[in-house]
C-alpha cells in the first residue's frame, strides 16, 4: 500500500492535535468533581464512565497522523494502569502539558534532544523525592481512604478494606458482575498462580485483556503438548462432558497450539491454555495441589500416563477461572474439603522438616494458596451500564490500594507532585537542558489545576494557594477547603504518582523528538453502481 509522509512542523501540528483531542476528552474526569464520559457501543446503551484509560482505549481519530499522537498518549495511560492500576488521567494530563510546552520551545529554536535530557534528569530527581516524601500505610483507616478516593465512594473504600482485612494484603481478591443491586462479598476455595494464558487469542474480555471461563473443566498435565495427534483423543472425550475447557500443561506449542487457537476463533471450542506454575518437582507438587483443589488428577509422565488415557474422573472443575498474561486465578474449585485439609497438613509437615530457607518459602506460598482461598466481590446495579461503571471503580480502588501498601502514600489531589517541586532547584543545568527541567516544573501544576477547574473553580488561583501552603497541605475539591490532605483523608499511592509522571515523561519524550510520520494512504471505496437505465441490458 502507498504511504503518505510528513516532516518537521507538520509533524508537530498533527501530533499536538491528536494529543489534545484525547487529553481534552479524558481530563474532564479528573478529581472528585470530575465529569463522566459516555462511550458509544455497537449494541445497547452507551457506557458512562470516568476511568481515564478505558476512555482513552476507546478513542481512534480519523486522521492517521493525529491518531498517532492520540495513540502515543494512550500508551502512557495504559502503562500507568498496568503498573499501578490508577493515575491514568493524571498521566495523560502530565503528558499533554509536557508535550505542548516542549513544542513551544522547539518552535522557538530549542533542540529536542537536549530538552529530552533535561526532562529525564528532572523526572529522575522527582522520583527520588517522591520516594523520600512517601510514608507507609498505617492501619485499616488509611486503606479505606485510598480506596474511597480512587473508587469515589466510601462504600467501596470500606468494602476493599474489609476484604483485605480478612484475606491479607497479598490475598487473592476477584471482582465479578452480579445480578443483584448492591455489593456482595463471599469467600470461596481457590488459588492463584503466576502463569497466564499461552496465547492472547484465548482472551474473552479484550478491554481487560483477560480470559474468563465459567463452569470450567480442567485438564492438568506435566507434559508438553506439541502435536494434534496426542491432543485430539483427549479433546474428543472431554468435549462430550463439557464445552468449557482449561488446559494446564508444561506448555502447549506448535501444531497443538495453532489447532486450539483456530478452533477457538471459529467458535468450535471455548478453551483456554495456561502454562503450569513452577519448574521440575515444584511444578509437579503445584499441579497436584491444583488437582486436589479442583477434584481432578494430574496426567503425569511419572505415572506413565498419556493424554489419550484421560477419563472423566481425571478432570477438575471450578466455578470460574480468570487468566491474564501474568497470572491465573481458580475460583471455587470442586475438590473435597477433607482432601484439601489433608494436603495442607502434608505441606505443614514438609515446612517443619525442611532446612532450606528457599524451600520453606515456596512451601509456605503453596500452603497460603490452599488455606487463604479467594475473596469474591460481586458488583450489582439497577442497569448494566451502571454495573459496569461500578465494577471499573472497584477494580481501580483495589489496584490503588495494593499500590499504596507496596510503596506507601503521599498527600493527594496533586499536592504530592507540587511538594516535590523544590528538588528541581538543586539541578544546575544550562541551555536547553535547563529548559527541559522548567517544562516539567510547569507540567506538575496541571493535575491540581484540572482538579480545581473540574470543581468549577479558577485553577490558576487554586494552584497559587497550594504552592504557598505548608508541605502536605492542599485543596480538597470535594468540600472546597484547604488543609492538611492526610488529615482530611485525601492521599494517593506513591506508586500511582510515580508511575503517572514516569510514563507521561517517557511518552512525551518520544513525541517531541519525532520528526517524520509515515501512514498508509487510505484508498477510497469504489462508488456503488447506479440503477440501470430503462430498456438497457
UniProtKB/Swiss-Prot annotation:
It is found in: Cytoplasm. Together with its co-chaperonin GroES, plays an essential role in assisting protein folding. The GroEL-GroES system forms a nano-cage that allows encapsulation of the non-native substrate proteins and provides a physical environment optimized to promote and accelerate protein folding. The keyword Cell membrane does not apply. Gene3D superfamilies: GroEL (3.50.7.10), GroEL-like equatorial domain (1.10.560.10), TCP-1-like chaperonin intermediate domain (3.30.260.10). One of its GO terms (biological process) is protein refolding. The keyword Cytoplasm applies. InterPro entries: Chaperonin_Cpn60_CS, Cpn60/GroEL, Cpn60/GroEL/TCP-1, GroEL-like_apical_dom_sf, GROEL-like_equatorial_sf, TCP-1-like_intermed_sf. ATP binds at residues 29-32, 86-90, 413, 492. It holds the Pfam family Cpn60_TCP1. Forms a cylinder of 14 subunits composed of two heptameric rings stacked back-to-back. Interacts with the co-chaperonin GroES. GO terms for cellular component: cytoplasm. Belongs to the chaperonin (HSP60) family. One of its GO terms (molecular function) is unfolded protein binding. It catalyses: ATP + H2O + a folded polypeptide = ADP + phosphate + an unfolded polypeptide. It comes from Dehalococcoides mccartyi (strain CBDB1). Its EC number is 5.6.1.7. NCBIfam families: GroEL, PRK00013.1, PRK12849.1, PRK12850.1, PRK12851.1. This is Chaperonin GroEL. Keywords: ATP-binding, Chaperone, Cytoplasm, Isomerase, Nucleotide-binding.
